[in-house]
């Protein structure tokens, strides 16, 4: 199980863990809300290949949980961001595989935790685990493609937050049949999504080196537009970080990205958000777009002031 509004890294790493369970002859499923996921094209690829029976709605898994059930959480460590709080509360044994910076509100009772903040993605960590498994029962090309998509998402196609281990994982996945061209297709969007993304980028303004864009509620199924627009805003000269806020169900969803000059996780943590240095998000409840904008700007002010103080102290 991954986080709410699961992305390609959450789903890709979950698919990798599912393969490990199968290698060990342990029955397992992936709990995922297919209506809210940002990895819809990946799910469709598995469904079209006849491999979709392992993706189960969270509510449907509750009746099969026993005292011996092991919950493996990927791509998040925060309890409030889990795909299903009910599954977490019902499972007595929990394993966490994550690469995000540890903060308040993390899962505090794991049986085992594999936490590496310097890894590019949860998919990279799962790749390393898979390489210890028997080669004769290893992953399929489709599973390798899912893991490669997770790495490509969190590294922005190997542009940021990559290390030697990242490229080693990608090379191993390529040797297992992952096709980069097919993987790239998972990032394609519809014409409507592209237009919504362009509208958000057009509405942005620059505040203290940060691009801020606000949007009223998007059509159903367009959640993927937020992180894409945030990434697009980083290509503007002089922009160190981007924040895209979109109204949703009486609240506001925020997607933030940076090139490394600002730590967007630190900026969004006071708003209840999480993530890591260059990629973070937050969900504000009972909040208007204007309130969200004010709170984002306040946190940018605080962060920039702290940066200035550190620079003065270093002189």
State the predicted function of each range:
Residues 1-5, 10-52, 62-69, 148, ...:
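Hydrophobic helix-and-loop "lid/oligomerization" segment in the mid-to-C-terminal part
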Residues 55-109:
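Active-site cofactor/cluster-binding pocket
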Residues 99-170:
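Short alpha-helices
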Residues 3-4, 74-77, 97-100, 129, ...:
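Fold-independent oxyanion-binding glycine-rich loops
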Residues 17-18, 88-91, 112-113, 169:
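Glycine-rich, phosphate-binding/catalytic loops in enzymes
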Residues 12-13, 41-44, 84-86, 106-109, ...:
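Short acidic, glycine/serine/threonine-rich loops at helix termini
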Residues 92, 124-141, 245-259, 304-306:
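A short, flexible low-complexity segment enriched in Lys/Arg and Gly/Pro that occurs
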Residues 51-60, 113-117:
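Short acidic-hydrophobic, aromatic-tinged amphipathic segments that line or gate anion-handling sites
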